[in-house]
Amino acid sequence: DEPKIECAYRELEEETGYRCENLEYLMSLNTTVAFCDEAIDVFVARNLIPSKQHLNEDEVINVERWSVEDLQELIYTGKMTDAKTVAAIMAYAAKYGKQGK
């Protein structure tokens, strides 16, 4: 199996079109505890370097820049409801504050 950190570096570039100088582990979470044992590891990417996306032909991923405050507002107003995304944003905000690090 591919080490988690190497997978995270690879997935970052493939899906966002960015590389980074370092990744910091933030948290792990289980997606559907009662249904399966799938776990997701969340990392924080720092010092992003533009690269190129390498998407599957059926994938469409648009990358946008958002402040932590704006992301939290989407959560609080019910406009962002994906549980893993909400958990990652709130964990980041709790650890680094609204302005990030």
Predicted regions and their residues:
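Unchanged
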Residues: 1-83
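Short secondary-structure boundary/hinge segments and terminal tails
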Residues: 31, 92-93
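Generic C-terminal helix-cap and adjacent flexible tail
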Residues: 94-101
